[in-house]
């Protein structure tokens, strides 16, 4: 049911050659449900495009991520350029490989600090060790995970923040490209629209994931309207 609105909104987002900004993130309703959502950045906010609901506390894995990403990919205008931002719970070998196979897709994936990385000099280390003591650092052609997934790394530690951004990307790493990751913050006020500052989704008495899925559709249509 959402497809016509999603297609129209995605087409409008790139009608003058702009890059389409997608974010992937998860929100939970206590321990009752986990909701993984892909949204479109619109100004300082976001619009939902596709989501999956699972009962119980969970980090929804690549199988679910891929299904949502491929649904959104099918709605994109031909030749559209895409930037996908995702938080540090989601990067995996499978996700990197999927993104590498998508023409016109760029990514900014935040990484945990405990991932193995071969920086191309010295010994294999961790992403956190590479970030230690640096406010900015940019590394091209590194190899992530034990499987050796090729990517670029940008590290940005803003004063006053407890943790740095460690961002994997398939574009040249520098200050401007690492700051692209801030585009994902539009998904946070969107989740607030669903929850405490809007529809009060956290107060739902629904017990079944499929019914919550339909409720999200109704709320999303209201956002598009």
Annotated model-derived regions:
Residues 23-35:
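An active-site-proximal beta-strand-loop segment
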Residues 2-6, 14-20, 31, 42-225:
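Single, function-defining residue in the core of a domain
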Residues 10:
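Active-site-proximal cofactor/substrate-binding loop regions of enzyme domains
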């Amino acid at each position: 049911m959402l497809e016509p609105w999603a297609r129209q909104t995605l087409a409008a987002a790139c009608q003058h050659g702009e890059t389409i900004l997608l974010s992937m993130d998860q929100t939970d309703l206590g321990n009752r449900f986990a909701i993984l959502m892909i949204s479109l950045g619109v100004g300082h906010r976001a619009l939902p495009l596709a989501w999956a609901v699972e009962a119980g506390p969970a980090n929804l894995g690549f199988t679910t991520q891929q299904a949502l990403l491929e649904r959104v990919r099918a709605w994109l205008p031909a030749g559209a350029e895409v930037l996908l931002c995702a938080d540090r719970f989601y990067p995996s070998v499978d996700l990197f490989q999927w993104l590498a196979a998508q023409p016109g897709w760029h990514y900014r994936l935040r990484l945990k600090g405990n991932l193995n990385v071969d920086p191309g000099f010295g010994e294999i280390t961790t992403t956190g060790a590479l970030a230690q003591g640096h406010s900015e650092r940019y590394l091209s052609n590194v190899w992530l995970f034990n499987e050796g997934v090729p990517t670029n790394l940008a590290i940005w530690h803003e004063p006053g923040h407890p943790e740095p951004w460690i961002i994997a990307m398939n574009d040249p790493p520098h200050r401007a490209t690492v700051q692209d990751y801030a585009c994902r913050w539009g998904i946070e006020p969107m989740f607030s629209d669903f929850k405490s500052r809007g529809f009060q989704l956290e107060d739902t008495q629904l017990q079944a994931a499929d019914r919550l899925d339909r409720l999200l559709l109704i709320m999303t249509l209201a956002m598009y309207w």
